[in-house]
Amino acid sequence: MVIVAAGASTRFGAADKLTAVVEGATVLARSVAAFVAARGVGRIVVVAHPNRVEELRAVARDAAAGREILAVAGGARRRDSVEAGVRACTSRYVAIHDGARPLVTPALIERCLAGAEGHAGAIAAIPVTDTVKEVRGGTVSAHPDRSLLWAAQTPQVVLRQAWLDAAGMSDGDETDDAAMLSRLGLECRVVEGDIENIKITRPLDLEVAAAILRGRERG
């Protein structure tokens, strides 16, 4: 299973979001802990910025409860980092997760793994509730049908070899792994995600995540 933690956190500001602390644990540690707790997860591979491999390996191992953790260097783009992680895995299916989604639950991970069985892959996603517009040159150019739109999350589970085959076909920089499989004409199943499975992108997201965690503790 691949946890991608190689980004530059450019929208987060001067601090690093992966080692930011939310309710007593770092963002990356919470992501790792969820995969450790999920059934059906084998080796966990953390993909880190080349300058931070040892640092993030240590963070991940502290959360791994004795499970095997491998840390590898990522690349300049997301797809390069994902490829490094996928190549470090040996399982038939690989779950790919953004390290900056610390509120993922073991249950969602297990649903995605189960959903991928017999298919090229499965992604977590939630229906879009806002009205979405396509904008070109500062003006609205199209009005997509909201009933057809889902916001993709992670984890995204893919057939390892299919992902590698698709990566070899083009040097594009897809922003998710369902798009990568689409190069081969393969379909991904959609597993309903979790509205609480937010991605930490800006400092305000840490406050939202902390509030969600406090709510979980209250039950």
PLM regions: where:
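Hydrophobic helical membrane-anchoring modules
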Residues: N197-G219
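Short beta-strand-to-loop acidic/aromatic patch adjacent to the donor-nucleotide binding site
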Residues: S91-R101
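Conserved core of the sugar-phosphate nucleotidyltransferase
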Residues: G42, L103-V191
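Acidic helix N-cap motif at the loop->helix transition within catalytic regions
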Residues: E54-A60
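Active-site nucleotide-sugar/metal-binding loop of Leloir-type enzymes
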Residues: D80-Y93
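N-terminal glycine-rich phosphate-binding loop and ensuing alpha1 helix
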Residues: M1-V53
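Residue-level signal for inorganic ion chemistry
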Residues: I3, L28, G85, H97-D98, ...
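Conserved donor nucleotide-binding strand/loop of the catalytic core
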Residues: A64-A76
